[in-house]
């Protein structure tokens, strides 16, 4: 099991939103593939300026924020939907400084049976095979481009640096690598990312001779340099023993994949690239291993302002303004309408969260699917049998806190990501982190290095304090447009492993239950007291395991009021806030704290655990939020919460004029045969663009059928003829044909099946 990041595509997404976001996901999938991991779930976290502002206010040399957020969402979702990857969590963070450069980051979860992962050395004589997509000029300069400062002319000159994604081809690579007999032939593997052939193949052995003339091309006319550095997508390089080359190429052909031997491992430690029979690169490995010139810099750390302490201010200014006027209802409603609190359901619904049939949590929970989940959870993608093992992933980050203090921002990013895992039923002691950093462009100015230095120090301190490591990450230091810088960004992704039965969901369950706040202890500098937090999270996990806590929500800087409303929306239950709760308690910063729903008859369990807690309120049947004399109906709260981004990411379809047929047949009962003696054969054809064959196969096998799948090969006329003949035989022997869903030329193929007569 592993996770992978995709921060590097903030640059191309700013230039070409659709393609840049698509390659963000494609690149993230390829990295676990190099370890033979099958990616089964993705998390998308993005940053933008306000997308509701008029287009007329767009900066010169920039695309409008509305264009960026819509285009990037379309690109990422298109790629994920085509390749058949569930996007389990989607969140867009809004901050005015992301107008400098959009943030497009995320993470994916991948897994593979341990027996399938072979890691050996490359020996002289070994062959390197390039498989997958062809090479073109798209992506030339993408690696260096991602580190450029953006100017007024970047949008006109950097378009060629954006790669063109090809999800169906990458799906074929996934299928190939998922076959045990294939993965065990691979001695070493590398994906094609930044640097293209020169890096992907150049990293596989100390001595290499690469024949660039053998690299498959999208079109003629590419010179040696372009072939060597192009970052065209969906390509992999594998090292195999010479005796296994033909076998590997045969397996690739079965999956309808191009595969070509392009390099050989040599005894002499030199990297040689040949083009048209002549070497155009011939470098000593010792020189490459120096990693370039040694560099040092001075750092001058900015101390956060005590007067501007983020923990002493309202996270949403409109809330503070309303509270000064004595308008608690107005403050609560304004909070729900804030860009970083409001519903993003229109955005989330652009993504397929259920493909693969492994997702445990949907993005929104409850009877009305209105309570947003904070953690994505999925079962491991086993091909045979069943599993109750699940993986969990969450994120933590607040750009406003980080802008005040990058150190505190990183500390609480780690803490918040942990709290979300714990609130979903995870065991914090098993958590591992991976960080993504995104900062302004660095120069020789010592003050500009303050942000990454302070942020990394904060993340390091949090890891040491909690005793939990970060095992990966990515960074970018190019978040500058002219004189505008992105906010200092360190996003913590927390990953955990749990059992299916341990998971709890955040929507309120039952009227009469109590809402309880567990608060973390902080020192005089507003830093969490790590040992106390660890003890608290451990006890909360025990309470979720034994059923005392039935739902929970990790608080953020927006406080209790936002969390109470979001927990209530899913089942449209109300909450009566206790009279002892102050407005400060309702709206203050709650980073690291957890709000939990507990049945009234189980409250004694908190005393047994010797837990400090505050009773916030009681769940009610009537869908109203009551606080003293203040009453907010469910409808009022939902209107405020759902209206903010409706014009950017609509959730309401245009009303049709045609009457909907109401004569729908409804069966009183479903008959399932108990005596499964006969095993009908189901034939599932796998066409280019198909992506549901695995879950379809498992569904039929659970029902007692025998399933046969075949890939339709179309690289040559002979492949097509052979495939037609094979399909004809398989259809003749089958009782059912099932055409799984997928994409062909971007068009959805609907689920359908044919039952064949038997004679």
Walk through the language-model features, giving the residues of each.
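Single conserved hydrophobic/aromatic residue that forms the stacking wall/gate
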Residues: 2-7, 753, 758-759
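Glycine/proline-enriched, intrinsically flexible loops and inter-domain linkers
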Residues: 1-4, 8-746
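Active-site-adjacent pocket-lining segments in enzyme domains
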Residues: 747-751
